[in-house]
Amino acid sequence: DLITNSYTRGKPRHVTSWRNLKTRDVCDSLVEGRCIHNGCQCDRSAPHGNCCDTDGCTSLWWCPKTKWD
């Protein structure tokens, strides 16, 4: 029960945090199609999967380097 309750309690916080980060995702053509997610710069041609699509960043972003702006 303790494990289940802890997992259930932690889940809403994780979802809320993800949505907050998601709103700051941007797929910027000005940086060669790179996707910037919460200070993390992502390449569309990354081997780990696409970073950008028409809706912005996907959950499969890969970060070769960080960018703080």
Curated annotation (Swiss-Prot):
Name the UniProt record assigns to this protein: Conotoxin Cal12.1p4
Species of provenance: Californiconus californicus (California cone)
Keywords: Disulfide bond, Neurotoxin, Secreted, Toxin
PTM annotation: Contains 4 disulfide bonds.
Intracellular or extracellular location(s): Secreted
Domain commentary: The cysteine framework is XII (C-C-C-C-CC-C-C).
Maturation propeptide residues: 1-23
UniProt tissue specificity: Expressed by the venom duct.
GO molecular function, one term: toxin activity
One Gene Ontology cellular component: extracellular region
